[in-house]
Amino acid sequence: MPAPVLSGPQYLREGLKLVLSPGLRLFVLLPLAINLVLFVGLIYLAGHQFSLWVDTLMPSLPEWLSFLSYILWPLFVVLVALMVFFTFTMLANVIAAPFNGFLAEKVEVVVRGTDDFPAFSWGELIAMIPRTLAREMRKLGYFLPRAIGLFILSFIPVVNIVAAPLWLLFGVWMMAIQYIDYPADNHKLGWNEMLAWLRQKRWQSMSFGGIVYLVLLIPVVNILMMPAAVAGATLFWVRERGAENLVTQR
């Protein structure tokens, strides 16, 4: 098996070790804590409103329907659990996006041994949010038309047999784009330039995107793997770009 195909798991494994180190834990724990506080607050508000609704509803029902109060609450708990399961990771990605840029910076400092980036400050983090969200919207703009095209393809007879493998390949490619974009954006590499560079490193990109795609499918584990993927993508960036520069200098 070619070495580039094996590089993805190696980068992710090294990235996981880095984010568990004392100097980088802040950028993992802080967005996770914000996400947890937000979800706890939303669940509390939803529970309070639901309780008021049940208290208002039950007196208006016939007595023989009083058993509904014992059914409504379990249904509410199941609904909340499903909502958390399907939206926690999605919201965590949005909240962590500005922190991921800083995490990529700090990983690069650790790997290179030189700090060419400004020190972390809350002011800079807040100033970074519009740019980060704009970049996330750019990713969404890249993803949606292609996803819609594949969705339509899934309903075309005969042709739809290729839809499943294409969905898988596209998902893997998007994982590479999602995480390599953080170090690329830190170095002000344009969107189209980043895509062109990833295509040049196609085997490495698909290897990295593939392993990230797999681990992010695992509930709970995926929360830790998101920052590990940022760190792994930064290692990918530093080493692959460094190798290119070395070849250019020669």
Swiss-Prot record:
Transmembrane feature ranges: 26-46, 71-91, 150-170, 211-231
Name of the protein in question: Sulfate transporter CysZ
Family, as annotated: Belongs to the CysZ family.
A Pfam family it matches: EI24
Organism encoding this protein: Pseudomonas fluorescens (strain Pf0-1)
Keywords carried by this UniProt record: Amino-acid biosynthesis, Cell inner membrane, Cell membrane, Cysteine biosynthesis, Membrane, Sulfate transport, Transmembrane, Transmembrane helix, Transport
Biological process per Gene Ontology, one example term: cysteine biosynthetic process
Record has Membrane as a keyword: yes
GO cellular component: plasma membrane
Molecular-function GO term, any one: high-affinity sulfate:proton symporter activity
Location of the protein in the cell: Cell inner membrane
InterPro entries reported in the protein's UniProt record: CysZ_sulfate_transptr, Sulfate_CysZ
Membrane topology: Multi-pass membrane protein
Its job: High affinity, high specificity proton-dependent sulfate transporter, which mediates sulfate uptake. Provides the sulfur source for the cysteine synthesis pathway.
UniProt keyword Nucleus, yes or no: no
